[in-house]
Amino acid sequence: MTAALMLAAAAPALGQPPIEQDLAALAKSAEAQLHQSFANLAFEDFALSPVHGPLFQASAGGRILYYAPESDHLLFATIYDKNGFNLTALSQDAAARAKLKHLDPKEALLVGPPDAPLVIEFTDPDCPYCRALDRFWAAKAAEGKAVRRQIYFVSGIHPEAASKAEHILCAKDREAAFRATYAGEPSKPLNRCADGAARVEAHAKAVKSMGISGTPTLILDGQLISGFSQAEIEAWLARQRPQAKPPT
């Protein structure tokens, strides 16, 4: 504190005010550090951000958000460290793992071999990307890379999602009904039953507790994946079944 006061007192009376001089020096130092820490990126400009003060982290709807109370800014952002690690994704995964206690596997629709790698899947029968994901899983199963899907239906986005989810959960052969529905060919009339309706409601509560707001959403070994991100899913599958080393 004493050193700072002495520096301020020694600042020249003419030219930039001391605070502006301090900010200019800080900006120059910060820009140099940016180029040093992230040397593989080309930056076109550099300026002071409108965000002031400490930055706090919160989660909402399955996403990590950042809040700066001093300037009252809310940031929808992804934070990386200098080694390229996605710190936002790590926080998101940790939040998802902490909420897994809200899921009851007995309420889920289980699809796939019991001994296969487990996928926790939040899906909507009328979501086109969910249907594409179902085709992807079918293709992987045909390649001998089947997974065990622990499925919860998200019924608050499309108007017919709840009735189609109930139809699947009321069927004698739920997996067959699931396949047909996701192929766009559910049998008519749609099945109705008290147990199916109760399960749809249980799924809705689980979805709310998990903070899921979009479909498909997957949890793979504690890693949260929003959307049908094929590259991330393929990478996870590769870790489940490492390729055999060629004979030497």
Where are the regions a protein language model picked out?
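C-terminal cap of thioredoxin/glutaredoxin-like
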Residues: 19-23, 27, 31-36, 44-48, ...
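Boundary of Sec targeting at the N-terminus
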Residues: 14-16
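Short, surface-exposed acidic
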Residues: 40-46, 177-180
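Structural alpha/beta surface segment adjacent to cysteine/selenocysteine redox centers
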Residues: 116-195, 208-213, 235-240, 246-247
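A short beta-strand-turn-helix
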Residues: 99-117, 248
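A short, surface-exposed interaction/processing loop segment used at functional sites
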Residues: 73-102
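Bacterial N-terminal signal peptides
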Residues: 1-9
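Envelope-exposed proteins and targeting segments
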Residues: 54, 61-63, 115-118, 145
